[in-house]
Design a protein with these regions (language model features):
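Amphipathic, non-transmembrane alpha-helical secondary structure
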Residues: 11-18, 40, 44, 48, ...
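Catalytic alpha/beta core domains of metabolic enzymes, predominantly
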Residues: 51-172
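Acidic (Asp/Glu)-rich catalytic clusters
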Residues: 18-25, 47-48, 82-87
Length: 173
């Protein structure tokens, strides 16, 4: 995991992630990089270098789309460099319960939307995943050995004691 202090520093994030990757020297490791504004170009560069990335702290579908763009640009750059795409893995981790905690605080106690925004966001994000990892450009990258960047539903334990412990898991199966 990249140090949180570096969340707003692209170059330092890339340097630390590269150092971690080289020291660990394990092909099944993913380096956590936050989905901050500075994290987006870091994700692109790390994928270009062939470093597996778990994008963390995702809360919005719009930012998810930017994360996917960074991933795809990194793969495309790597392919242009004549480097292999096989074996590169990435996940985009949505922090579900944190979304509802933030939104619920702004809703009235009796709002029917309480505990629903994160699930709705995850469903929209999954549809975007299906859309973005299809079509001619994706088929070209896939033909070169690229894998999709998998959505990962993180923070699935509810923070509100009024919600079922399995709220997110059940709704997203």
């Amino acid at each position: 995991e990249c140090t949180p202090d570096l969340a707003d520093d692209t170059e330092a994030t890339v340097a630390q992630a590269t150092s971690l990757w080289q020291r660990l020297d394990l092909p099944n490791v993913m380096i956590k990089v936050p989905a901050t504004r500075a994290g987006l170009p870091a994700i692109e560069e790390l994928i270009r270098r062939g470093i597996n990335v778990n994008v963390t702290l995702l809360f919005a579908v719009d930012r998810y789309e930017e994360v996917v763009d960074s991933y795809l640009r990194g793969l495309s750059a790597r392919a242009r460099d004549g480097r292999p795409l096989e074996g590169i893995a990435s996940a985009a981790s949505f922090f579900l319960s944190r979304i509802d905690t933030k939104v619920d605080a702004r809703l009235g106690e009796n709002s029917p939307l309480r505990g629903q925004v994160a699930i709705a966001s995850a469903r929209v994000a999954y549809q975007r995943y299906l859309d973005r990892f299809s079509g001619q450009e994706w088929e070209r990258l896939s033909g070169l050995g690229a894998r999709t960047q998998r959505p990962l539903w993180a923070s699935t334990g509810t923070k509100n004691p009024a919600y079922s412990d399995l709220l997110y898991v059940v709704e997203l199966i």
